[in-house]
Amino acid sequence: MGKLYVVPTPVGNLEDMTFRAIRVLKEADLILAEDTRTSGILLKHFEIKNAMQSHHKFNEHKTVEGIVNRIKAGETVALISDAGTPGISDPGFLIVRECVKSGIEVQCLPGATAFVPALVASGLPDERFCFEGFLPQKKGRVTRLTSLQEEKRTMIFYESPYRLVKTLTQFAEFFGAERPVSVCREISKIHEESVRGTLTEVIAHFTQNE
């Protein structure tokens, strides 16, 4: 029986790719990529020429059975996403769950993920926190925010820059305008930035500077 490797890839800076991640990808029989075009650039940079197949939220329910069967037959499969660690607000959970059900060994390599550096650099309490990822766009959004109104721990959210001010404004409505917040963007890139302050202050910053 083969094995499934979950391989983190850089969230911005290619120097964050680990030696082990490169080796695993070069040794894999098949690389599952969220977007083969995006991952193709990464693989080309590190001279990785192994077979690659798209694996994303729109096709994973159809392809997971075939992939599991290939691993059962002895193949080594590596799963990557466009950036960061697969399964963290990215495809990955479904195939990992099915591999575990089938008794297939799953190894997740340590490596890049966006929320850890953002949290540590925020200056907000990080000994206890809750990760919420992306909020629902429509249905369930208000319900989710309402359920979090009494949450005292540091909460971590992902958001598109195009929806940032709208989401921060909702946070002020549900969590209080004076709640401290940190917005981290362009993580590990040249223009990395963390904007810290109350929700009122940070909303004003991005309203004026976007």
Describe the predicted segments one by one.
Residues 11-12, 82-86, 161-163:
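Short glycine-rich anion-binding loops that position phosphate/pyrophosphate groups of nucleotides
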Residues 64-113, 117:
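Glycine/small-residue-rich loop that forms an oxyanion/phosphate-binding "nest" at active or ligand-binding sites
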Residues 3-4, 73-78, 154:
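Loop/turn-to-beta-strand initiation segments
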